[in-house]
């Protein structure tokens, strides 16, 4: 599960800027392309960009408490492996994305000294807030934060009824990254 989780729109955007996409990974239709703990990355050319979306299930209240304990070690291993790959390949740019959950990756000692940027998905055309943190060596200036009227709820609240829009209850919908944010 995890490292190369680039949506097709993000891949196309990178291609328009002259980046070559590793076709063996880009052809996959699902969001998870390989298990970074087992995959042999030495067969690929040095990447210019690494984007990693570390799964948030280990810290999500939507995950059963018993499962969260088991998943925390896995999340820590994925985070360490992602940072190892960034150090090994030294890409020009790297990004690690994860919800800004106070019990999540934000707390990881591995992430403590890395530059980060916070944003809220509602500021990128999504009907729900979802505060997200992106650690990166690229200056992500202008990241938008929620300015929603606190007296009115967002159109959709993840994990709480989905505002009559069941499509947001599906895992693929929750894992999506807003296209305008990808193009930022």
Segments predicted by a language model, with ranges:
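Conserved active-site and SAM-binding loop architecture
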Residues: 1-184
């Amino acid at each position: 599960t995890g490292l190369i989780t680039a949506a097709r729109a993000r891949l196309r955007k990178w291609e328009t800027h002259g980046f070559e996409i590793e076709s063996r990974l880009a052809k996959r239709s699902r969001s998870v392309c390989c298990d970074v703990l087992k995959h042999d990355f030495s067969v690929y050319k040095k990447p210019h960009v690494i984007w990693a979306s570390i799964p948030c299930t280990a810290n999500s209240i939507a995950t059963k408490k018993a499962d969260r304990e088991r998943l925390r070690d896995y999340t820590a291993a994925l985070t360490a492996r992602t940072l190892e790959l960034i150090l090994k390949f030294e890409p020009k740019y790297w990004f690690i994305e994860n919800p800004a959950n106070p019990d999540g990756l934000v707390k990881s000692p591995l992430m403590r000294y890395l530059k980060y940027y916070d944003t809220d998905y509602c500021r990128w055309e999504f009907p729900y807030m979802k505060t997200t943190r992106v650690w990166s060596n690229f200056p992500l200036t202008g990241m938008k934060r929620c300015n929603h009227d606190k007296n009115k709820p967002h159109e959709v609240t993840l994990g709480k009824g989905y505002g009559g829009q069941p499509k947001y209850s599906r895992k693929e919908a929750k894992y999506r990254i807003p296209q305008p944010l990808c193009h930022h």
